[in-house]
């Protein structure tokens, strides 16, 4: 029984490692700077959506990594502290970029949500109309 858990952990670690290796290779060949971790997330998401990888194959290690995510951000926090001098020089520019990006992100997210919700409401209305038409056909009321 414990052998299966170890194998499951090792197979999940291998899947994550392979995805990160591929994303690192892709990141080095891209003409624009893109974090390999973001590329890895896109690859993992794509593989899950295409059902190349089943959720069960990566779920327990993903849950474990999510549980220690605060610990994984410690090196990033230390890097930010080491860069405080540079950040102080460009404080206004950095703050402006953060505020503008946040406003744009909120606007795009809101518009996208309205688009999706509006699409769902339209489909619901179309489905109701179709049911009424089909019900009328059953009773011989629609020509």
Curated annotation (Swiss-Prot):
Stated name of the protein: Antiholin-like protein LrgA
Membrane topology: Multi-pass membrane protein
Residue ranges of the TM segments: 7-26, 31-53, 58-80, 90-112
Main location: membrane
Lineage: Bacteria, Bacillati, Bacillota, Bacilli, Bacillales
Span of the signal peptide: none
Keyword Transmembrane: yes
Keywords, alphabetical: Cell membrane, Cytolysis, Membrane, Transmembrane, Transmembrane helix
Entry's localization field: Cell membrane
Any one Gene Ontology BP term: programmed cell death
Recorded name of the encoding gene: lrgA
Organism this protein belongs to: Bacillus anthracis
Family annotation (Pfam families): LrgA (PF03788)
């Amino acid at each position: 029984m414990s052998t299966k858990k170890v194998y499951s952990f090792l197979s999940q670690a291998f899947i994550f490692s392979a995805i990160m290796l591929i994303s690192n290779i892709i990141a080095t060949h891209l003409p624009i700077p893109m974090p390999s971790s973001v590329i890895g997330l896109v690859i993992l998401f794509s593989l899950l959506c295409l059902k190349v990888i089943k959720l069960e194959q990566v779920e327990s290690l993903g849950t474990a990594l999510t549980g220690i995510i605060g610990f994984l951000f410690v090196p990033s926090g230390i890097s930010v502290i080491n860069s405080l001098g540079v950040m102080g020089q460009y404080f206004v520019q950095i703050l402006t970029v953060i505020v503008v990006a946040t406003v744009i992100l909120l606007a795009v997210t809101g518009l996208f949500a309205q688009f999706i919700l509006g699409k769902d409401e339209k489909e619901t209305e179309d489905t109701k109309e179709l049911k009424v038409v089909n019900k009328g056909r059953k009773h011989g009321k629609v020509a």
